[in-house]
Amino acid sequence: MSDIHEHKILILDFGSQYTQLIARRIREIGVYCELWAWDVTEAQIREFAPNGIILAGGPESVTAENSPRAPEYVFNAGIPVLGICYGMQTMSEQLGGKVIQGVGEGEFGYAQIEMLTKSALFKDIEDAVNSEGKPLLDVWMSHGDKVSAIPEGFVAVAKTDTCPFAAMANEEKRFYGVQFHPEVTHTRQGMRMLSHFALDICGCAANWKPSSIIEDAIERLKKQIGDDEVILGLSGGVDSSVVAMLLHRAIGKKLTCVFVDNGLLRLNEAAQVMEMFGDHFGLNIIHVDAENRFLDAMKGVADPEAKRKIIGRVFVEIFDEESKKCANAKWLAQGTIYPDVIESAGSATGKAHVIKSHHNVGGLPDDMALGLVEPLRELFKDEVRKIGLELGLPYNMLYRHPFPGPGLGVRVLGEVKKEYCDLLRRADAIFIEELHKADLYNKVSQAFTVFLPVRSVGVMGDGRKYDWVVSLRAVETIDFMTAHWAHLPYDFLGRVSNRIINEVDGISRVVYDISGKPPATIEWE
C-alpha cells in the first residue's frame, strides 16, 4: 500500500476566502496537503516535511505595519514555493522586491494576462494568442496592491495592462508568484497550473485518491481501536454515515450505532436509515424512538435558538443514556471533518483568519470517559462524499441537499407540534419529488419547504377551508455564504402548489420565497 501522506504540500493561510479552495484543488490533483496559519514555526514546518509550500491570499496589505509575513524558513528550506495574490506580494517584499498600495486601480474579476516568457508553472498552457503571437490566459483577479519591483533572481512571467508583474518566477530556486487566483474556476487553466506545481515542480506522486484513503483509514482504525468496542451517533447524514461504513469495514460487529429518531426527520427517513444500515449493510444499530420526548421538551417554545438548544440537550441526554448501556464501549466515534479542525486550530498570534464551520457533534458529556475516534478529520466534505460512494453508499443519499441539524425543528416556524411536522413532511416530499421529476433537483443548491403557523382561507369544491400555509424555498449558491433564489419555472411551481394543496389535507396555500442571502438567510430560522 502506497503511503498517502508520503508526498505533501503545506498551505499557509493569510486569511483569504479562497484558502480552503486551494487545499481542495491540491487534493483533487491527488496530493495530500494541510492548511496552517501563516505564523507557524520553523520546527513545525520541518516536522511536517512538505515537498512544497503555497502562500495563500489574504485581505491585508503588505505595505501596512505588522501585516502577516511568511516564516523566513519558507525561503531557506530548499523546496518549491508558490505565492498566490497576497502570497506573491509578501514573497516579493520579503525577498527584496517592492509592493505598492493600490490607489483606485486594483483588478477585481476577470482579466487576461499576457505571457512574457516560458515557465515551468505555465508549461504548455494558453487560452488564446494575441496579434504579436504572445500566449494569453483567462484568469480571476482580486487585488488592490501590486508588486512594483521583483526580487533579484526573478523574471516577469506575465503582465496585464495595469499590473506589470501578474506572475513572476525564480526557476533556479523554484519560487513562483501569481497575482491572480488559480484555484477558482474562473481561471480556466488554474488546475493545470496547480498540477504543474504539485506534481512536476514539487515532484509529488498522486497517491491521494478515494480507494487509498479508505485503505489507510481502515488500517489506522484497526491500530487505534484494537479489540475494543466503539459507539457512534448515526444520524443518517453524510458524515456519520461514512464514519459508520469505515468502522464497519475496520471492526465489524464491535461497532454499535445509536440512531435517535427525534420526530423531526424527513418523510420515511427513519425507516430508510434502519433499512439501509441495519438490513442492507448489517450494522449493529440501537433505534431510539424519541419523538414524544423531543416534542414534549419543545412544548410552548417558539424562539428558534431556544428550540435548537433543547434539541441538542435532549439528544445528548438520550445518547448518554444509551452509551451507558454499551458498558464495553471504549471509544466514541465522531464525524469531525477537516474544516472543523481548521477552525479549532486558530493561530499562534491570534492574527490569522479563522474559518468558521459547523461542528459535527458538540456538547457530549465530559464524564463519558471514552477515547475519540475521528476517521474523517483529514477530509473535506467533497472527499467524504467520494469515499462514501466508494464504500457503497447511494449517490442520492450522499449528494442530497443540506438538512439542518435540528431538522424540522427550525423549518416549522414558532412552536413545533406533531401535526405541523406531519404536514410539512408530506408537503416537502412532494416538492422534492417534483424537482427530481423535472430534472431540477441537481440544478439548485438547496430546496425545502417551510411551515408557517398562519391559517389562510381556501376553496375546496363548494365549501371553504381555513388551513395552514407553507412556503417553498430553493436557492442557488457556490459556498452558502451568499445565495440567489432559484428562478424555477412558473408551470413547475404551479404543479407543486396544486399537488400539495390537493394531496395534503390541512394546507390551503403555497407561497414561494424570493429572498436572496443577504439580506435573508437560507433557512427561515
From Swiss-Prot:
It catalyses: XMP + L-glutamine + ATP + H2O = GMP + L-glutamate + AMP + diphosphate + 2 H(+). Its EC number is 6.3.5.2. Residues 208-400 form the GMPS ATP-PPase domain. It comes from the Bacteria. The keyword Transferase does not apply. The keyword Metal-binding does not apply. InterPro entries: Class_I_gatase-like, GATASE, GMP_synth_C, GMP_synth_GATase, GMP_synthase, GMPS_ATP_PPase_dom, NAD/GMP_synthase, Rossmann-like_a/b/a_fold. CDD domains: GATase1_GMP_Synthase, GMP_synthase_C. Pathway: Purine metabolism; GMP biosynthesis; GMP from XMP (L-Gln route): step 1/1. GO terms for cellular component: cytosol. The active site is at C85 (nucleophile), H181, E183. GO terms for molecular function: ATP binding; GMP synthase activity. It is an enzyme of class 6 (ligase). Pfam families: GATase, GMP_synt_C, NAD_synthase. ATP binds at S235, G236, G237, V238, D239, S240, S241. Keywords: ATP-binding, Glutamine amidotransferase, GMP biosynthesis, Ligase, Nucleotide-binding, Purine biosynthesis. Residues 8-207 form the Glutamine amidotransferase type-1 domain. Homodimer. Catalyzes the synthesis of GMP from XMP. HAMAP family: GMP_synthase. This is GMP synthase [glutamine-hydrolyzing]. It comes from Shewanella sp. (strain W3-18-1).
